[in-house]
Amino acid sequence: MWWSLILLSCLLALTSAHDKPSFHPLSDDLINYINKQNTTWQAGRNFYNVDISYLKKLCGTVLGGPKLPGRVAFGEDIDLPETFDAREQWSNCPTIGQIRDQGSCGSCWAFGAVEAISDRTCIHTNGRVNVEVSAEDLLTCCGIQCGDGCNGGYPSGAWSFWTKKGLVSGGVYNSHVGCLPYTIPPCEHHVNGSRPPCTGEGDTPRCNKSCEAGYSPSYKEDKHFGYTSYSVSNSVKEIMAEIYKNGPVEGAFTVFSDFLTYKSGVYKHEAGDMMGGHAIRILGWGVENGVPYWLAANSWNLDWGDNGFFKILRGENHCGIESEIVAGIPRTDQYWGRF
């Protein structure tokens, strides 16, 4: 009897795996198929003439990795609005509206973390500390605790590193903002552009514990620390409450090739093969045409999606989006002398 059940489970799994058609990730056929489905979102071309290895490397998060301790639930104690956008709630915190570019490196796990940490540092200091926390510092200096740099990592390790070792400031590539700006250049998704071509060959830069020339204070003095870091349960209300009270969070989910074509609307997987795990920053929620969504920021530059942002189905743990939420609270006492 139990052999029959196992066989049935396998058959169902195989059937499910083939429910959705498969297309080349960069094909017009994939885009056209999605747009003919009368689904909740629209597809378009975000990438031209890039290596498939590059597309897969963009998805550099190891799903199901180490877990941080959970925080005490408080979602039932908060009256939550139907729609929320952290960019509007904390309009004095400019990093919330920023879109970064991870380049040819599987560093999404680091970007999702430093973006949310930057936002929360501003939020928890009432707008007094506006800092772009360095993805470079986290990517290159966290080590094995965070995974394998450009070859993929763990969001939980990123937040733990922030609380234990701290992170310096650092803006986007060639910005000369902060102690350690990002050293991996953006690459060209489009045919006629000035950026270098996108490949899957990016190596992890080495850890450099000194700020770029002309910047002060020193690397050690520039560190920003977290007071605590934790995981948030997959309860929709708890995730919403966390964002509403403390600011954007880092989330991770399984990317399928149709996500690469997202342009607008509420993303729901329709077609294509699995590309890998991907980390992003979730900054709000809402309802569009009756469909509940999470509002999120990607790290594939402004050319991708809806000016770098996207919406994804909320409430069904779609592609695992509600399974791996991590966050933390900044150590604000380190700034007291500055106010």
UniProtKB/Swiss-Prot annotation:
Sections of the chain in a coiled coil: none
Pfam families, per the entry: Peptidase_C1, Propeptide_C1
Disulfide bonds: C93-C122, C105-C150, C141-C207, C142-C146, C179-C211, C187-C198
EC number of the protein: 3.4.22.1
Catalytic activity: Hydrolysis of proteins with broad specificity for peptide bonds. Preferentially cleaves -Arg-Arg-|-Xaa bonds in small molecule substrates (thus differing from cathepsin L). In addition to being an endopeptidase, shows peptidyl-dipeptidase activity, liberating C-terminal dipeptides
Sorted UniProt keywords: Acetylation, Cell membrane, Disulfide bond, Glycoprotein, Hydrolase, Lysosome, Membrane, Protease, Secreted, Signal, Thiol protease, Zymogen
Disruption of the gene: reported phenotype: Enlarged thyroid follicles, reduced extension of the thyroid epithelium, and increased levels of Tg/thyroglobulin in the thyroid follicles which fails to assemble into multilayers. Lysosomes are enlarged and CTSK/cathepsin K is absent from the thyroid follicle lumen and mis-localizes to the apical membrane of thyroid epithelial cells.
Gene3D superfamilies reported in the protein's UniProt record: Cysteine proteinases (3.90.70.10)
Subunit note: Dimer of a heavy chain and a light chain cross-linked by a disulfide bond. Interacts with SRPX2. Directly interacts with SHKBP1.
Name of the protein in question: Cathepsin B
Organism: Mus musculus
